[in-house]
């Protein structure tokens, strides 16, 4: 197991980011705060799109942004869910805003983006349960996220390239499967008309 090896060094997330903070949700009772031009990320967007988020279902307006604690998260930032689906992580490919349920991080070194993404996924599966605050809904807070320790190894770029190649292959196979399913549906509908 790669992450069970001894790391060269360990750094806390807060030491790897230029900016890291939760978002905010504009009041839902003010219609003018919504349906603007600013993409507004939801857990649903993250679960549907996976690693890279390229669009959002909801949008907020400039007024919605100004009248909440939401902020514009620049492209190629890491976004981690602190409430629902705790620990779910994505990389945004477009600037967007998030709710207070998400902690967004702008990294100091963009070359580490994929590595930290992969590590946070591993962390979610193996360790995040130890950090959960219990209550009506288990969650973590921003300070907990900032203090997550990230191990660094001498060959992480090779590791990342290997995982990216696997991801690319999986995505290609999913695309092929989707096309085959479409072809099957078309042929069946042609046969029975």
Question: Locations of the language-model features?
Answer:
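Non-catalytic DNA-recognition/assembly elements of restriction-modification systems
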Residues: 1-24, 40, 154-155, 164-191
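Short, basic/aromatic beta-hairpin or loop at an interaction surface
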Residues: 47-59
């Amino acid at each position: 197991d790669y992450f069970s090896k001894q790391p060269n060094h360990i750094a806390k997330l807060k030491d790897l980011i230029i900016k890291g903070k939760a978002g905010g949700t504009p009041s839902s009772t003010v219609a003018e705060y919504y349906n603007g031009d600013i993409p507004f990320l939801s857990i649903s967007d993250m679960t549907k799109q996976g690693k890279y988020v390229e669009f959002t279902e909801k949008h907020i307006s400039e007024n919605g942004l100004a009248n909440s604690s939401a902020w514009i998260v620049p492209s190629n930032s890491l976004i981690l869910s602190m409430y629902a689906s705790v620990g779910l992580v994505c990389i945004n490919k477009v600037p967007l805003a998030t709710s207070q349920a998400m902690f967004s991080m702008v990294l100091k070194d963009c070359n580490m983006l994929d590595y930290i993404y992969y590590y946070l996924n591993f962390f979610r599966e193996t360790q995040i349960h130890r950090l959960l605050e219990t209550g009506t809904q288990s969650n973590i807070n921003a300070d907990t996220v900032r203090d997550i320790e990230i191990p660094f190894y001498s060959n992480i770029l090779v590791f990342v390239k290997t995982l990216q190649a696997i991801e690319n292959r999986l995505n290609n196979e999913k695309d092929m499967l989707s096309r085959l399913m479409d072809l099957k549906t078309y042929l069946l509908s042609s046969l029975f008309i």
